[in-house]
């Protein structure tokens, strides 16, 4: 089996015991299986939930807290307990672990996003096993990842993973709830995530987790768009992750055909960047960009909205108002208003400018 880069996401329900603490048995089972992946020569990144579930009982809560301050306090206690347990277990296999705590804002800021990319690359090159969790103790509720499902998809794209394995307490996707319907049909393979498939997944999470099957399907769709195939399911024993790579996993495989990966810069533009303004273009420019992969030039710009600086991301629309994509603009809004509609040869070189593209095709993403 060729060396692969694997991202494994383990949810709260697959880690915590019935009382809310860390299940030593389950955690040891996961670590043994992850160590087997490393033993087979694969690079592994672990996305783990469980900080809140691990910490709430230590603070005296009888059950998982429902308030934001309660959840964040539990996460502050539980994250250290969770990491300590992982580190001790991985040490038995001679594996060095590294902790990264991320929030949504880390992805929206280009510099921090690039730093995360560089750090993960160096850790993997050094044969360490990165363990990533959302920084639950400071995350804003409206900016969370959904039990780390979406975080796992975004990280899998960031590191150009070959596969994302989302492990949960359900063995795959069904056409109806298998716990309530004996005739529920299981999907063993899905070539893509369609609207019909998305509608089958419920929103409810488990008692100890916040991400239901809907968030896992959404994560799978995002991972596929980034060129990463996905497995959603469950399993036990040391060989469970290796079995997934062999096509013998107990769950649903999603889009396991080779995909074209998206470059890091374009991932950031497409999924994480904040839009600072809007550029309207004529029909000729829209066709050149979308159908022929050309850069956007000032001649095709018909209107500029907002106040943005050089390097900020802007949305591009047709004269009918249809959004066709977004990209990093090489002009400020003020500069672009001065040169919109002009031919390149008619524009005076300003400052250190060496090119006239408004948005270069390498910094453009179609929507």
UniProtKB/Swiss-Prot annotation:
Keywords on record: Amino-acid biosynthesis, ATP-binding, Cytoplasm, Kinase, Nucleotide-binding, Proline biosynthesis, Transferase
An example molecular function term from Gene Ontology annotations: glutamate 5-kinase activity
Protein family: Belongs to the glutamate 5-kinase family.
Cellular compartment(s): Cytoplasm
InterPro entries reported for this sequence: AceGlu_kinase-like_sf, Asp/Glu/Uridylate_kinase, G5K_ProB, Glu/AcGlu_kinase, Glu_5kinase, Glu_5kinase/COase_Synthase, Glutamate_5-kinase_CS, PUA
Catalytically driven reaction(s): L-glutamate + ATP = L-glutamyl 5-phosphate + ADP
Lineage of the species this protein comes from: Bacteria, Bacillati, Bacillota, Bacilli, Bacillales
GO cellular component: a single term: cytosol
Domain PUA: from-to ranges: 276-350
Keyword Transferase assigned: yes
Transmembrane segments: none
NCBIfam families to which the protein is assigned, alphabetical: proB (TIGR01027)
Pfam families named in the record: AA_kinase, PUA
Any Gene Ontology biological process: L-proline biosynthetic process
Pathway the protein takes part in: Amino-acid biosynthesis; L-proline biosynthesis; L-glutamate 5-semialdehyde from L-glutamate: step 1/2
Protein name stated in the entry: Glutamate 5-kinase
Gene3D superfamilies membership: Acetylglutamate kinase-like (3.40.1160.10), PUA domain (2.30.130.10)
Function: Catalyzes the transfer of a phosphate group to glutamate to form L-glutamate 5-phosphate.
Sequence positions that bind substrate: 49, 136, 148
Keyword Nucleotide-binding (UniProt): yes
